């Protein structure tokens, strides 16, 4: 009788006080592409145990042909989906996100929409998405088959079976303002436009 042996390697990175988890890495096939998924906040399930979210992430990642996933979050504090312990900034977490997405073949932004009106969520989302701009060509979100339910968290019933949709950072945060080059005389430029218009008349 034929048998199949599989190995699931797990690596988890925590803060020194073990109150934050910056990275949960699951690898089952080194020869296949890897993805990074950014969600809201981590649970304590980081080893043998799998919470519902991680289980859905692993199943869907495997079905889509990936061989590993880096599970990341906007906020690193364990079991804080209510964002009661949320900080304005977390450089260590942001650094972990950037290091992961640099190596990933695809990035999935899946923080969900449940906290979209929260100021601390908006602030952290802007920080993270700004850092993701250089990797925007790899950025996607979860959607349903019709493509109407975008920006979903993996626990959303609408995306239990994943469909990926390209995501532009500008869909969620404003584009940075373009600064005028030094020495540019804006008033003079406006005046020249006016004169040109008169001459054209």
Region roles according to the model:
Residues 1-14:
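Helix-enriched interaction subdomains in cytosolic or periplasmic regions
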Residues 9, 33, 130-133:
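Compositionally biased amphipathic helical and low-complexity segments enriched in hydrophobic
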Residues 10-11, 67, 147, 195:
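Generic secretory/membrane-interface signal
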Residues 15-106, 110-119:
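A polyanion-binding, active-site-adjacent surface
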Residues 85-201:
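Glycine/proline-rich loop-helix segments at beta-alpha junctions forming the active-site rim
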């Amino acid at each position: 009788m034929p048998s199949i042996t599989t190995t699931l390697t797990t690596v988890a990175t925590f803060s020194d006080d073990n109150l934050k988890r910056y990275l949960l890495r699951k690898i089952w096939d080194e020869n296949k592409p890897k993805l990074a998924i950014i969600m809201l906040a981590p649970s304590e399930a980081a080893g043998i145990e799998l919470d519902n979210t991680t289980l859905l992430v692993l199943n869907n990642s495997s079905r889509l042909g990936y061989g590993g996933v880096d599970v990341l979050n906007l906020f690193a504090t364990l079991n804080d989906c209510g964002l009661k312990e949320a900080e304005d900034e977390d450089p260590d977490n942001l650094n972990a996100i950037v290091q992961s997405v640099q190596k990933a073949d695809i990035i999935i932004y899946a923080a969900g929409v449940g906290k979209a009106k929260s100021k601390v969520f908006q602030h952290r989302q802007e920080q993270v998405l700004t850092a993701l701009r250089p990797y925007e060509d790899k950025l996607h979100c979860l959607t349903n088959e019709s493509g109407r339910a975008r920006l979903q968290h993996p626990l959303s019933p609408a995306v239990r079976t994943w469909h990926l949709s390209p995501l532009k950072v500008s869909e969620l945060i404003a584009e940075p303002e373009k600064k005028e080059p030094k020495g540019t005389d804006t008033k003079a430029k406006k005046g020249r436009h006016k004169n040109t218009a008169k001459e054209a008349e």
